[in-house]
C-alpha cells in the first residue's frame, strides 16, 4: 500500500514538474511557423498537391531532435550555445559566429515582420507601410511583457501558437482535403521534378531555424526545478508537444494549399496576397480572413522571438547587450526600407529563407560537438545513435544548401 502511494506521489511530482517546465519549447516552436513557412508551404502545396507533405514530416522530426539537443545543452551546462562557443573557440571564430548570427537574426526578422505587415494589410485593407507600423507597435507591446519575467511571455506566445493551430483546423474544415491522398503524401517520399527538389529544400530551410537553436539553450539554462535528469525528461515532453503542434500547422498549411489551389487548377499561387485573394472565392470570406489573422499571429509572435534570439546571440558571443526596445527599433529598419523601396515582399521572404538555411549547419556543428562532450554534459551526453543522426542531418542540410546555391546561381 505504502509502495503504491509513493509511486503515485512520484508520478504526481513528475507531472507537476512537467507543467512547471512547460513553455520554452513553445517560444522556440514559433520559429517553425513563421511567415516564411507560410510562403514555402503554400507554394509547395499549390504546385505539387500532397506530394511534398513527407518533407514537412521529416523536417519536423529533425527539428524536434535539434531543439531537444539545444535545450539539453542549457540544462546540462547552465550556459547557452553562444556562450559555449565564446568559451571554447578562438576569438576570430567567435566574432565570425556573432556577425553571421546577427545577420541571420535580421534576415529572419525581415521575413517575420513583413509577413505580419502583409497580414494586417489583407485583413484591415490598409497599405503595407501602415501594416508595418501596426506590426511595430504590436511587437513593442508584446516585448514589454519581458519585464515581468519569462513566464508571461511564454503564455502569450504559446497562446498565439495555439491560435494559429486552431485557425488551420478551421482551414482544413473549409478546404476538405482528401484524407487517403494526404496520408500517402505524408508517408511516401516523392520528388517529381527539379522544381520539387528546390521547394523541398526551401521547406527544410524554412522549418529548421538557426536563431531558435541559440535561443532554446538560453531559455533552459536557468531552470532549477528538480534534478538535471528530471529537467531533461520534462523538457523532452515540452519539445514533443510544442513541435507536434508546429508540425501539424505546417502540414495543414500545405494540405490546405493543395486542396484549395492545386486541385482547382490554381497551381501558380506563390504569394501571400495571392493566396488570400484566391482563397476568398474558392472557399469563403471567412476562410480568407482566418488565413490573414493566422498570418498576423504567426508574424507577430515570431518577430518577438527573433528579437529575443538576437539579444541572446549578442550577450552570449560578445558579453554586450542593448535594451530590447533599441534592438527592436534597429531590426525594424530593413523591413521599412524594403517596403518604402517598393520591393516584392514575398520575393524578399523567400530570399531570406535561403539565407537562413546557410546558418543551420553553422549552429548545428558546435551544438553536436558540445552535446557529445562527456566532460561538459556528464550523464546527459549524446548517445551514439543521436550523434549519428545529428551528423546525418548536418550532411543533408549542407548538401541541400549547395544544391540551392548552385540552382539559384544558374537560375534553375
Curated annotation (Swiss-Prot):
Transmembrane segments: 19-39, 46-66, 94-114, 122-142, 156-176, 196-216, 241-261, 290-310, 322-342, 348-368, 392-412
GO molecular function: cadmium ion transmembrane transporter activity; manganese ion transmembrane transporter activity; metal ion binding; symporter activity
Keyword field contains Membrane: yes
The entry's keywords: Cell inner membrane, Cell membrane, Ion transport, Membrane, Symport, Transmembrane, Transmembrane helix, Transport
InterPro entries: NRAMP_fam
Pfam families the UniProt entry points to: Nramp
GO cellular component term, pick one: plasma membrane
Bilayer topology: Multi-pass membrane protein
SS bond partners: none
Localization in the cell: Cell inner membrane
Record-level GO BP terms: iron ion transmembrane transport
Protein family per UniProt: Belongs to the NRAMP family.
Purpose: H(+)-stimulated, divalent metal cation uptake system.
NCBIfam families (alphabetical): nramp, Nramp_1, PRK00701.1
Protein name (Swiss-Prot/TrEMBL): Divalent metal cation transporter MntH
Organism listed in the record: Cronobacter sakazakii (strain ATCC BAA-894) (Enterobacter sakazakii)
Gene that encodes it: mntH
